[in-house]
Regions:
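Short, flexible, basic/aromatic active-site loop/helix in glycosyltransferases
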Residues: 136-158
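Short, surface-exposed amphipathic charged segments that create phosphate/polyanion-binding patches used
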Residues: 62-66, 130-136, 245-255, 272
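GT-A fold catalytic core of metal-dependent nucleotide-sugar glycosyltransferases
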Residues: 71-137
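A structural signal for short, well-ordered beta-strand segments and their strand-loop junctions
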Residues: 7, 45-50, 91-94, 99, ...
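Catalytic core and acceptor-binding pocket of nucleotide-sugar-dependent glycosyltransferases
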Residues: 154-271
């Protein structure tokens, strides 16, 4: 069976990025071409998906979710569509990524792995995830500790909060995930049934946090046994741009670089003619 790379992009396919109206998205074609070139290089299919690919999802626009939230829910909806294909595994990559010229084939690198994803250690996000799982989704007991202690690293590891910037899943994992997750036709009812349709915003450790894809994935981890397949994805596959480019001689090697936040996107635009940056990435 073959593999596929998915990227979510809700901008129009004919978007004119020279138009001032798209100024804030001027980074998109550079990242998109980097990811597409990588897919061609490793000879896998490359699919760009958006909210518009899910006609049954359009009712979501009647409710008070941000565009970002609605876009992240696509990471749940597409799992159902993946199961209708013949692909063996997928890698989902966030749009705001660029690929190193030295990056190996992500599927060959993880040929024996079914579920690769980084842990999400942000304390406020883990706490937010815990509240949604316990008080809204009723997926875990009120007294459950959402961390497990890793004796080897002497560190608390989140059970249900994983990082969705870059991840790999096999058909076996996805088949279990979709058995409990809503699809494009049921997600609105799912949100209603769990008192999430009014988009509650939580105050957690001084930060405002809302319900997104990570929380729905956490729900699936709690309701199934898929985490038995999970292995932590290495940092080089979801590296932050500061460590890749802004540490001088201490810059770290990477395979996929994540241009997180507005600063990350601006960094790329500011360095399109800088060989110290561009010689490292394929755009």
């Amino acid at each position: 069976m073959s593999n596929v790379i998915y990227v979510i992009n809700d901008l129009p396919k004919d978007a004119d990025f020279a138009n001032p109206g798209y100024k804030d998205a001027a980074w998109v074609p550079h990242c998109l071409s980097s990811l597409e070139n990588y897919a061609k290089k490793i000879k896998v299919d490359f699919k760009v998906i958006s909210m518009n690919d899910f006609p049954g999802y359009q009712d979501i626009h009647q409710y008070n979710f941000t565009h970002y939230q609605k876009s992240t829910f696509v990471k749940v909806l597409f799992l159902h569509e993946f199961m209708k294909t013949d692909y063996d595994k997928f890698a989902l990559l966030d749009l705001d990524m660029v690929v190193s010229k030295t990056a190996p084939n992500i599927f060959d690198f993880h040929k024996d792995d079914d579920f690769m994803m980084q842990y999400g250690f942000n304390e406020a996000v883990v706490k937010k995830n815990e509240i949604f799982l316990k008080e809204y989704l009723k997926a875990i007991p009120e007294d459950e500790d959402v961390y497990w202690f890793n004796e080897k690293t002497q560190r608390n590891i989140p059970k249900y909060n994983l990082n969705l910037g870059c991840y790999i899943m096999s058909r076996q994992v996805v088949s279990e995930m979709v058995s409990v997750l809503p699809n494009q036709y049921t997600i609105v009812d799912f949100l209603k049934e769990n008192n999430l349709i009014d988009n509650p915003v939580l105050e957690v450790l001084g930060e405002r946090k809302d319900f997104i894809d990570q929380d729905l994935y956490g729900y699936a981890y709690a309701k199934t046994n898929v985490t038995r397949f999970h292995k932590p994805l290495q940092w080089v596959w979801n590296a932050n741009y500061q460590a890749c480019f802004q540490k001088g001689e201490a810059n770290k090697d990477f395979y996929l670089c994540h241009l997180c936040g507005e600063d990350g996107k601006q960094f790329l635009l500011d360095n399109l003619n800088n060989p110290e940056v561009m010689d490292k990435i394929d755009v």
